């Protein structure tokens, strides 16, 4: 790492009635952050919630269209249903995601005290709540049939996205960006193709590209002169009367979609990428995604990079991620306690069924 102060974008996130978190605050330090926890501890939820607060999107889609009862924590849902069955008319539970940001030129316009902690801070807030004005009558009819109430009626909710100054957020005005990298959702070939094309574009002058095109064309022409191709075309020509009156032959596709750069395939130690081991493929997916996105993001979020990796490979990968993102804040989730032995405890956040500890 450089001697410069480590970058920080996100200071903490507050989650209320969101997925498995009834009321939780997760804090982050500058530079590299590692969230360690077992499966179902909520690591993925925290990363998705950070991205949600910055974009108002859940897995790429607007949250207002993705909201379902399953986003409301089970404890809040159970209390709500018990109150309904007891004959009450409680308002449905409110869902809150608050992202507290470090103050900078990019975030100062998001400053205010419109947050659950009452802090004068920079940040963004997603709130999903019952829309009484629009659905008051419908909700009244809904709770009257208490025997039919089995879930929180999120169809009667509205989703608001505000900054801590209580202003509605214009997505184009958000100057802080994140990149969420989950190897399980990335196609290895598309990442490799993008990386290759970028290297080709940046490295080859027009003359060199023309020479490669000519060399590839020569290979195509020599293939057409092969005796096996000639034999195939002779057989086709002999049977052409069955399908056409014209001479029927096969030749290499010479269209723009079959040029030399599209015929290249990346290899590792002479082995095609898709033949590499699962751990190596996951590592490549993450590093290729970083190469593509790191320049455009202030915050890098990486989901469980350790799949199919040995402990030593995981440590090497984390070091490479950190090295590639020296000027970015990074949050990595993992269920591997091995990293505790390799990193300072100040880099770790432990997630469990209890409140998270840093």
Language-model features: where?
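A general secondary-structure signal for short beta-strands and their flanking turns/coil
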Residues: 8, 21, 90-96, 119-123, ...
């Amino acid at each position: 790492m450089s001697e410069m102060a480590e970058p920080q974008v996100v200071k903490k996130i507050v989650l209320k009635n969101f997925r498995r978190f009834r009321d939780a605050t997760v804090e982050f330090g500058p530079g590299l952050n590692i969230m360690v926890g077992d499966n179902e501890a909520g690591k993925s939820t925290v990363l998705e919630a950070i991205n949600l607060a910055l974009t108002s999107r859940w897995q790429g889609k607007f949250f207002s269209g993705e909201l379902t009862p399953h986003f409301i924590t089970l404890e809040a849902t159970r209390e709500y249903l018990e109150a309904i069955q007891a004959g009450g008319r409680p308002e449905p539970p409110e869902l809150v995601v608050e992202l507290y940001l470090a103050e900078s030129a990019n975030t100062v316009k998001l400053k205010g005290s419109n947050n659950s902690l009452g802090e004068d801070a920079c940040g963004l807030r997603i709130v999903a709540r019952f829309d009484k004005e629009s659905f008051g009558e419908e909700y009244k009819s809904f709770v009257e049939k208490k025997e039919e109430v089995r879930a929180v009626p999120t169809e009667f909710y509205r989703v608001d996205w505000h900054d801590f100054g209580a202003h509605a957020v214009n997505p184009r005005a958000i100057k802080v960006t994140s990149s969420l990298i989950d190897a399980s959702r990335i196609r290895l070939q598309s990442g490799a193709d993008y990386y290759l094309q970028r290297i080709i574009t940046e490295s080859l002058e027009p003359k060199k590209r023309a020479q490669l095109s000519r060399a590839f064309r020569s290979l195509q022409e020599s293939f057409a002169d092969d005796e096996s191709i000639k034999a195939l075309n002779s057989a086709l020509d002999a049977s052409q009367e069955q399908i056409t009156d014209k001479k029927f032959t096969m030749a290499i596709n010479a269209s723009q979609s079959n040029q030399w750069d599209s015929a290249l395939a990346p290899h590792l130690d002479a082995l095609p990428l898709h033949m590499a081991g699962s751990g190596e493929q996951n590592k490549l997916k993450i590093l290729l995604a970083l190469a593509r996105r790191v320049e455009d993001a202030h915050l890098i979020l990486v989901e469980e990079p350790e799949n199919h990796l040995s402990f030593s490979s995981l440590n090497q990968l984390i070091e490479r991620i950190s090295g590639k993102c020296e000027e970015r804040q990074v949050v990595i989730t993992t269920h591997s306690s091995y990293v505790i032995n390799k990193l300072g405890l100040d880099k770790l956040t432990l997630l469990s069924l209890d409140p998270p500890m840093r």
